[in-house]
Amino acid sequence: MHQSDVADRSLFSLSWPIFIDIFLHLATLLINTYMISHVSTAYLAAMGVGNQVFDLFITIFNFISVGCSVVIAQYLGAGKRDKASQAIHISIAFNFLLGFSSAIIILFFGYNILNVMNTPEHLVQDGYNYLHILGICLIPEAISIILAACLRVYGKSKAAMYVTLIANIVTVIGNMIVLYGFFGLPQYGLVGVAWSTVVGRIIAVVLLCGLLFYGLRIKFDIRLLVIWSKNMLAKILHIGLPAAGENLVWILHYMTASAFIGLMGEVPLAAQTLYFQLSLFLMLFGIAISIGNEILVGHLVGAKRFDDAFTRGFKSLKAGVLFTIGVVIIYWFMRDPILYSITEDQRIIDQLLPLFILSVFLEPGRTF
């Protein structure tokens, strides 16, 4: 596809593969949560803290991908493919450093993080075993977020979606083996689930690299990974940092809430874990539409079509709010079958049911 065609594509044609991709991406942790919930409530509570720490770092990685997407889209819209390639390399290198630094923080301060979040004492060791292995996953995760964002900007949303699907299949198969002892292997519990996630993410990075550098014939230049243009990085950060601020505050809010809930015991913490994952899915429509909008508006601005970019932005906002309202209403009416499908613990279900009414008012406002 010629890059100028991207600006003239419909929002739906770009957003639905992005929706499926992010859905599958979030489904990795939800699959872990679902499978663990049928094994042990204690494991579920211990995993919840680790998942929230993981999501916090993912939010940090995403601010680079947002800035990267907009900058690349503008360069492609203006026909400056060399500049777009430079932005890709800088973003990959910067996110790799963020991922590596995050993994080091979890490795050395994992116990401190769990204690700050008031994790019940009998869950701390299981939580750390899960968290420190999941920390290794942050390195390929940081890289894959950038690679997938670059593919979307080039109009290859479906390719990123298929890669995430493959990674999820690998994770599910791995979970089945380590949790249920298939093929005569021992049951590894949370540690096995974490390693399954790591393997799935590494496979995703390999596939995404192949699609970006070989499929799109973008020349891989190692010099661009180590020699950065300060102006280019500043432009990416200038766009990405404000975009990440709201999501970062939202994740920190949940982590703070979890710290208080941790004082209440194992069952409330397990309930918070499930509600946190369900909340992420409620946001999916708005997230997918916003990313599709970023790509379209970036191409339009790069092509100097400012009026079209302005109109496109408000149409996307309207679509995002309407879709979110529709999804929240469906969630409300389906709350009982949803909860009974993901846990059999009646104590957790009783605590979760009243929270669904909050989502009816909270999620449409968050779409803005």
Predicted regions: what they are:
Residues 1-13, 194, 209-250:
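Interhelical loop/hinge segments that connect adjacent transmembrane helices in multipass membrane
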Residues 9-69, 73, 241-263:
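Signature of the first transmembrane helix
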Residues 27-45, 114-121, 179-188, 248-281, ...:
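Helix-terminus/linker motif at the lipid-water interface of multi-pass membrane proteins
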Residues 41-52, 127, 131, 194, ...:
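Small-residue hotspots at the loop-to-helix junctions and early N-terminal turns
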Residues 44-104, 141-160, 271-335, 366-368:
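Small-residue-rich hydrophobic transmembrane alpha-helices
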Residues 101-132, 326-353:
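Short membrane-interface helical motifs at transmembrane helix boundaries
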Residues 121-147, 346-368:
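Alpha-helical transmembrane segments of multi-pass membrane proteins
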Residues 168-206, 335, 350:
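Membrane-interface helix-loop junctions in multi-pass transport and translocation proteins
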